[in-house]
Amino acid sequence: RFWHPILVSALSEDLDRISVSAAAQVVRESMKSPEARHMGVPALPLTDLYNAAGDYVRARGGTLHFRCPVESFSADASQVRVRVRDQQDPKRFDYLVVALPFDALDSLLPSTAESTPIREKISHFENSPITGIHLWFDRQISELDHAVLLDRTIQWMFHKSRLQPIRTQGDNGRSSGSYIELVVSSSKTLIEKSRAEIVDLALAEVREFFPAAREANLVKSTVIKEVNATYSPRPGIDAFRPTPVTAWPPVFLAGDWTATGWPATMEGAVRSGYLAAEAVTQAAGVPGHFLSPDLPASGLMRLFT
């Protein structure tokens, strides 16, 4: 009962489909030290985080191109040619890092023999869905910033109007309502349900756990189904997770589904980016090390590391 929401949320898969190694990694990391158990929750909209990352790139001479989908690439030992939709001539680069989900990568790979090994690995992957339910109430329903809902379909509640305060007119500039986000990982049972059915289910469970919600009026609701949210960490899948290095010397892979040593979490995604960057610098002859060291074990956990 304790580990179910933790493992399903971290791995986005049902317990009977999760590999033992993936589950053990989550348990080991969460118990390694007090710092490892801390949960980070964004205190500002994710768009602001992304914009800050873009500013960082631009400040260092980089350029960001939006709304220009890449249709294909080809490469030799020293150069990559990238074909962008609606542009006649391919763009040329010294190196290419492909940071895409595994199914999107499959459609981008060249129709050459070099693509066969990575395509064979991709064929073993399956997706797992995550559903987010956003509810706006006309009054405060809880003083909690976040909560776990045990033994229910809803796994997590994030009180967004407390975590990211929305300033409104009146009430001394503070929002008088509640905006909450509910998260269901491995949400296979919700994919075929209608938006109305999901909202009704969510309301029933929220009102069960938060009595103040029973008197609140629902102002607005949104349901977001990420059908292909993460890869499924089934037994044996680690053997098919690729490293950043590909059959094309100047082309590298990144993504939470690659061989990071972590499951499909934000930490795993960040690690994949660091590993890809290290591979690029290695190929360029200026090796760099960017991967942050794991937190050291403390207390009794030092006996098991």
Regions found by a protein language model. Give the residues of each.
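Mid-domain catalytic core of redox enzymes
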Residues: 68-213, 224
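Short, hydrophobic alpha-helical segments
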Residues: 57-60, 94, 277-285
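FAD-binding beta-loop-beta segment adjacent to the flavin cofactor pocket
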Residues: 163-173, 226-253, 257-260
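Active-site-proximal substrate-binding core of FAD-dependent oxidoreductases
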Residues: 281-305
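Active-site/ligand-binding neighborhood in enzyme catalytic cores
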Residues: 1-75, 79-80, 92
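A conserved FAD-binding loop/helix module that cradles the flavin
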Residues: 259-280, 284
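General small-molecule cofactor/ligand-binding pocket signal
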Residues: 63-67, 91, 219-222, 252
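Flavin (FAD/FMN) cofactor-binding core of flavoprotein oxidoreductases
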Residues: 10-11, 200-246, 297-298
